[in-house]
Amino acid sequence: MSQALPETLESRLTEAFGTDAVGKLSVPGSGVVAVVLAYNEALRFPYFLEHYRALGISHFIIVDNASSDGTRALLKGMADVSVIPTDKPYRDHKSEWRQLLCERYLQERWVIFPDVDELFVYPGWPERPIGDLTDYLDTNGYRALFCPMVDMYPGGPLKNVSYRPGQSFLDACPWFDGSGYRLAPLKGSHRKRYKTPARHVFGGARERLFHHNSKRPGTWVDNFVLKTFFSLKSPMPKTRFGRLADHLLFKLVKNALPDTAAVQSKIPLIRWGSGYKFSGGVHGIAQEIPVAPVWGALLHFKYLDDFQSKVSEALERRQHTDNAGHYREYDAQMALLMKRGPFDGGSTRFTGMESLLSCGLVRGKLRRKHRSATREH
């Protein structure tokens, strides 16, 4: 009895996407490429593309997951965009789609993985192109950039938001939480299964608005430990022993924190290596790889005109984590958000990179002459 031939990359691509066209893309041989998964994003795509083109992205590979709002027609004919249509379930294939595309087209290339409601910014933005950033990363041997996700929102009720395609997202949602974050290890088995990064960001507007349940009240000891060891400005552990000590120390305070804690960070810019495996989203990867001490940020624009319809859509499709668990939280608070909005007295207005640097949501800077970076202290 003859042995079956090993599964080829092309056949895996065809199976994952449901089309053999995915193996025939024309992707430039240089520059940073964006790999984007999208569903019904016609509202955001015009400005999203404008922003990332201004950064210097050379090409966009966009997986259109059966959009029905004109997204595909909007993207048609753009020379720097390759669209892969698929109706396969997002929840079952999101990691595989990204990984297979990189294995096929982007080995040892810099790849960015933004959602369409995310704007990537970094030290030196908007003056410095993304090529300066990847030059720094290459020169210093780093293979990934860590980025907090910063939820952006309007200064009033969501019912008053009026956004039009092509307008800057920041015109509609210029506010964010400048405090209330922590930099901590993951709980449970994910900490062992996904080694990069060593810590993740939690907190911010999402936790303030939606996550208040904890196993016990916090104490002054909890506050001291969190402020001293797990603030945004605390260092990442760099050794196996450091990670273990980090885990044991965090166990002292974890029961005083919300049981449901959304990860508010990603590693969206990666020099792709063979076999890399995502943790579902772009929050972490299984392999331990060198991550730069410099941080960028992903400005996250969920609260536009379509927020309510997007939540209803997500609840109906159930394609997101935990059967759209986060969207159930949004839905439970919808009336209050539409009436009052996420803004509160501690909100900070985004006026440029200094807004993020000053509160620890971005680290470092790019030097103009040598294309290298130094750590902000």
Q: Could you say what each language-model-derived stretch is?
A:
Residues 1-50:
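N-proximal low-complexity "stem/linker" segments adjacent to membrane-targeting elements
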Residues 2-8, 124-377:
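Catalytic-site signature of metal-activated, phosphate-bearing donor transferases
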Residues 12-13, 70-113, 121-127:
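Active-site-proximal specificity loops/subdomain of glycosyltransferases
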Residues 39-41, 65-68, 78-80, 86-89, ...:
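An acidic- and aromatic-residue-enriched active-site/binding cleft used to recognize and process polar
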Residues 50-59:
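Short, acidic, metal-binding catalytic loop of nucleotide-sugar glycosyltransferases
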Residues 58-66:
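Short beta-strand/loop segment that forms part of the nucleotide-sugar
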